[in-house]
């Protein structure tokens, strides 16, 4: 090697090696401080891209797991409301069995009907007001719930939100009870015929001293003859058409006795009679069966969501482990690298000092 002063080759080599060890020491310290093997794309471009895709999947699957938990919450909320509807239907069925008993009076039936109506109103209230995060789940406002359970498009689970109320269950009050309106019988009072004299001669019959008033009656007698009794004598009124005119009498009016006959008429009264329909219990059984079917579907979807969550969590764990192998720093390796490069730094610094002294040997030739 030529003895030169302008260029100190040994010093340059030593500086280069010192820079390398310093850079390696810096990388080791960075990895140890961050815990990551890849802190930028320059550390491992391909590994960084793979790890980034893993991160996207992990984040998406973690959110999908939370979505599935929300799906469980929706189905649990809906099932809880259906359970209360079922309780009301069970009570209505119990009351219907009671109402079918022949020992009940109309008052008893009315009392039973009152509670049934309240229970039916409560079913409709539960249907209309049960909601999850502002979404009504039983009113038919939203017929289907879609839950995103994957990281890609169309990775969803859908389940129906059945409309459950009195109409869809077929248990409206008129489906269980018949309400018939009947007319009460009426009593009559008022002057109809005032016969103060009665004469019979031979084969001819004469009626004198009779005052006749005309009354229009909407209805009819319930038998061919009506028997009136004042406590001592009976009076017979024949059910036949007759016309009384001056000089001419058509038809027959027969009286027994010679007392004033009075008729009074009150307006017919509407009476509502409640009867339990023959198929009321079958109707209620069908309604309970519909509620049970909806509840079973919700229970099944809860189990499905739980299985989905378990699978998502397993996938997240596996992807996290794979990403860790690519992205995370191995502390044993990095500590070893740091120690090695620290030694190289110390050695390089010492050697550089020696290399810088090499040109001094050239000066000895000039003495």
Swiss-Prot record:
Induction (record text): Although swimmer cells have only a few flagella, the elongated swarmer cells are profusely covered by thousands of new flagella synthesized specifically in response to growth on surfaces or in highly viscous liquids.
Pfam families per UniProt: Flagellin_C, Flagellin_N
One Gene Ontology molecular-function label: structural molecule activity
Alphabetical UniProt keywords: Bacterial flagellum, Secreted
Cellular localisation: Secreted; Bacterial flagellum
Predominant location: secreted
Database matches in InterPro entries: Flagellin (IPR001492), Flagellin_C (IPR046358), Flagellin_C_sub2 (IPR042187), Flagellin_N (IPR001029)
Domain of life the protein comes from: Bacteria
Gene Ontology cellular-component terms listed: bacterial-type flagellum; extracellular region
Coiled coil regions in record: none
Role according to the record: Flagellin is the subunit protein which polymerizes to form the filaments of bacterial flagella.
Record family assignment: Belongs to the bacterial flagellin family.
NCBIfam families: PRK06819.1
Protein name listed in UniProt: Flagellin 2
Organism of provenance: Proteus mirabilis
Taxonomic path: Bacteria, Pseudomonadati, Pseudomonadota, Gammaproteobacteria, Enterobacterales
């Amino acid at each position: 090697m030529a003895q030169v002063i302008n260029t100190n080759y040994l010093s340059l080599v030593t500086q280069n090696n010192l820079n390398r060890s310093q850079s390696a020491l810096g990388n080791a310290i960075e990895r140890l401080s961050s815990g990551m093997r890849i802190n930028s794309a320059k550390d491992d471009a391909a590994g960084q891209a793979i790890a980034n895709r893993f991160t996207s999947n992990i984040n998406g699957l973690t959110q999908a797991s939370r979505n599935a938990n929300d799906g469980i919450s929706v189905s649990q909320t809906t099932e809880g409301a259906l359970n209360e509807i079922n309780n009301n239907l069970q009570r209505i069925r119990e009351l219907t069995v009671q109402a079918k008993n022949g020992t009940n009076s109309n008052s008893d039936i009315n009392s039973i009907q009152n509670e049934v109506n309240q229970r039916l109103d409560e079913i409709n209230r539960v249907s209309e007001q049960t909601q999850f995060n502002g979404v009504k789940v039983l009113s038919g406002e939203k017929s289907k719930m879609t839950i995103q359970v994957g990281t890609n498009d169309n990775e969803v689970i859908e389940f129906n939100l059945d409309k459950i109320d009195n109409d869809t269950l077929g248990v409206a009050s008129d489906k269980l009870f018949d309400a018939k309106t009947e007319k009460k019988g009426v009593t009559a009072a008022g002057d109809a015929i005032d016969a103060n004299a009665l004469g019979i001669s031979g084969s001819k019959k004469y009626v004198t001293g009779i005052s006749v008033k005309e009354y229009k009656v909407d209805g009819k007698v319930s038998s061919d003859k009506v028997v009136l009794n004042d406590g001592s004598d009976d009076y017979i009124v024949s059910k036949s058409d007759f016309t009384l005119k001056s000089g001419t009498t058509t038809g027959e009016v027969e009286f027994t006795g010679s007392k004033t006959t009075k008729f009074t008429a009150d307006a017919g009264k509407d009476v509502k009679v409640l009867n339990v329909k023959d198929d009321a219990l079958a109707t209620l059984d069908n309604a309970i069966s519909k509620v049970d079917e909806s509840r079973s579907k919700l229970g099944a979807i809860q189990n499905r969501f739980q299985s989905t969550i378990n699978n998502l969590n397993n996938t997240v764990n596996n992807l996290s482990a794979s990403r860790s192998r690519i992205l995370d720093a191995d502390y044993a390796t990095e500590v070893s690298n740091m120690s090695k490069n620290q030694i190289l730094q110390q050695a390089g610094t010492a050697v550089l000092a020696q290399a810088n002294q090499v040109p001094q040997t050239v000066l000895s030739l000039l003495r």
